Regions:
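Conserved segment of winged-helix/HTH DNA-binding domains
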Residues: 88-107
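Glycine-centered, phosphate/nucleic-acid-interacting loop/turn motifs that mediate DNA/RNA or nucleotide
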Residues: 79, 85
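Alpha-helical residues within the helix-turn-helix
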Residues: 59, 76-77
Length: 107
């Protein structure tokens, strides 16, 4: 049985520093769509271990940087990750990290 966003009443995102409840259809849909991609779930697992930049994630997952960058934008738009810029050996790096530790879905 496939789960659709219309069947979800509420999503709770729980983190060390903040917790929020999502109950609007548009926001729930954004999160469900972000989690529907196997590639995006792999990225979440990767940065759960350690925050990383696009090139590290792409290398570890054996995917192109362009693809990873596009997927990170979708995860960031859904509010599941945060990104910050840091100086690196070859310029500025965009470091991605999980924003929350848990996602609870209520029906």
């Amino acid at each position: 049985m496939e789960l659709t966003q219309n069947e979800i009443l509420e999503v709770n995102l729980v983190g060390k520093e903040e917790s929020i409840t999502i109950d609007t259809d548009d926001q729930v849909e954004e999160i469900v769509k972000a989690l529907s991609s196997n590639t995006r779930r792999k990225i979440l697992r990767q940065i759960q271990i350690e925050p990383a930049d696009v090139s590290k994630i792409a290398s570890d997952l054996e995917m192109t940087e362009a693809n990873i960058s596009a997927q990170i934008k979708k995860l960031e738009k859904a509010g599941l990750i945060t990104c910050e810029y840091s100086s690196g050996a070859h310029g500025v790096r965009k470091i991605s990290r999980l924003r929350y530790d848990e996602l609870l879905i209520k029906f």
